[in-house]
Swiss-Prot record:
It is found in: Cytoplasm. One of its GO terms (biological process) is L-proline biosynthetic process. Keywords: Amino-acid biosynthesis, Cytoplasm, NADP, Oxidoreductase, Proline biosynthesis. GO terms for cellular component: cytoplasm. Catalyzes the NADPH-dependent reduction of L-glutamate 5-phosphate into L-glutamate 5-semialdehyde and phosphate. The product spontaneously undergoes cyclization to form 1-pyrroline-5-carboxylate. GO terms for molecular function: glutamate-5-semialdehyde dehydrogenase activity; NADP binding. Pathway: Amino-acid biosynthesis; L-proline biosynthesis; L-glutamate 5-semialdehyde from L-glutamate: step 2/2. It comes from Clostridium kluyveri (strain ATCC 8527 / DSM 555 / NBRC 12016 / NCIMB 10680 / K1). This is Gamma-glutamyl phosphate reductase. It is an enzyme of class 1 (oxidoreductase). Its EC number is 1.2.1.41. Belongs to the gamma-glutamyl phosphate reductase family.
């Protein structure tokens, strides 16, 4: 069977499963999620062996530390993925929820009800945890899912898929509920992006190249999960100890994720007090600093930042720094270089904070907190499928509700339209 026929068959299977899955009870879906968690833990050794193969290939091909971190699995991470499945099982089922009900003057009763999107394709890079997160959220929200992970994680993803799919089938979910594309050829993605008849939506999750390719080439509707060129702006009134703590957390806790800070903007009134000490601390933690001319005057040994640096999602221990003369200049910089993901201001000035909240166009905007909180778990949604930076159909962390659409139900007693 060639690539096209193989992907087409998987899409047909998933589409067929979606019809059955959309009408399955919450109890069956929850039982499946629990069984998937059990199988994940039961097959831990096989998954770790498969992950070692991927890690060896990644290291031999010179992948950076942030990439290796995203790819790495260990017992704790597998247990965390299993725990995530259990948490999703404990969340309220959005399917069938009546979000609004009203009666018209002609006695028609009209309701708006949550229903599944249908069949969802997830295209992602070297993030084995996405295999579990995506499957969990799709199952609970009554959607079938087609998973296409990056070739760098093919062994890990396949081992995870085999475990969770076994659990799903044994618990009574229809075959095809979770499909996995184990082909690494580029054509596999190209085929998936054109299967409008069987796939309702595609969600790409990864770097800018992947997302751009899917958005530009897919005929299937796309929910764009975001590139995270996130900024922290330290205002003239900021508590500098708080600013240091937030900046260090936002940059170094997990530099390889989309809600990590990539650019630090500092008001010139506090630049001399903040930048030398903060950048010394960051440098000791392995962060490379690239700054504007004003920053370089304060710390001469750094590399001069370019426009490309300010536009870059580094996903690494690299930080671009710029000294600005005002909140206006900070807002202009974010408007020019931001990716509508997560932006933060550190300030003790109420007027500045409210202006920042109003004027910054992003999925999540923070006052005196780290950008690292843009996450489904941290927002209380449970697991997430990704962070949407577009405005249709969803924005921000995408949990269960964001994987549904609406259906109008209308009760009548023989009414006809005049």
């Amino acid at each position: 069977m060639d690539i096209y026929d193989c992907i087409l068959e998987k899409a047909k299977n998933a589409n067929r499963a979606a019809r059955t899955l959309s009408n399955m009870s919450t109890d069956i879906k929850n039982a499946a999620l629990i069984k998937m968690a059990e199988e994940l833990n039961k097959n831990k050794d096989d998954i770790l062996k498969a992950n070692m193969l991927d890690l060896e290939d990644a290291k031999s091909s010179g992948k950076n530390d942030a990439f290796i971190d995203r790819l790495t699995l260990n017992e704790n991470r597998i247990e965390s993925m299993a725990s995530g499945l259990m948490k999703v099982a404990s969340l309220p089922d959005p399917i069938g929820e009546v979000t609004r009900m009203w009666k018209k003057s002609n006695e028609l009763n009209i309701g708006r009800v949550r229903v599944p999107l249908g069949t969802i394709g997830i295209i992602y890079e070297a993030r084995p945890n996405v295999t579990v997160d995506a499957a969990a959220l799709c199952v609970k929200s009554g959607n079938s899912v087609i998973l296409k992970g990056g070739k760098e994680a093919i062994n890990s993803n396949l081992a995870i898929y085999n475990a969770i799919n076994k659990g799903a089938i044994e618990a009574g979910l229809p075959a095809g509920t979770i499909e996995f594309i184990n082909m690494t050829e580029r054509k596999a993605v190209e085929v998936l992006m054109k299967l409008n008849e069987y796939v309702d939506v595609l969600i790409p999750r990864g770097g800018s190249g992947l997302i751009k390719s899917v958005v530009e080439n897919s005929t299937v509707p796309v929910i764009e999960t975001g590139i995270g060129n996130c900024h922290v702006y330290v205002d003239s009134s900021a508590d500098l100890t708080m600013a240091e703590n937030i900046v260090i957390n936002a940059k170094t806790q997990r530099p390889g994720v989309c809600n990590a800070m990539e650019t630090l903007l500092v008001h010139e009134a506090v630049a001399e007090k903040l930048i030398p000490h903060l950048t010394e601390t960051l440098s000791k933690m392995g962060v490379e600093i690239r700054g504007c001319l004003k920053t370089k005057r304060l710390i001469p040994d750094i590399r001069l930042a370019t426009a490309e640096d300010y536009a870059q999602e580094f996903l690494d221990l690299i930080l671009a720094v710029k000294v600005v003369s005002s909140l206006d200049e900070a807002l202009d910089h974010i408007y020019k270089y931001g990716t509508k993901h997560s932006e933060a201001i550190i300030t003790n000035d109420y007027t500045s904070s409210q202006r920042f909240l109003r004027e910054v166009d992003a999925a999540a905007v923070y006052v005196n907190a780290s950008t690292r909180f843009t996450d489904g778990e941290e927002f209380g949604f449970g697991a997430e499928i990704g962070i949407s930076t577009q405005k249709l159909h969803a924005r921000g962390p995408m949990g269960l509700n964001e994987l549904t659409t609406i259906k109008y139900i209308v009760y009548g007693e023989g009414q006809i339209r005049e």
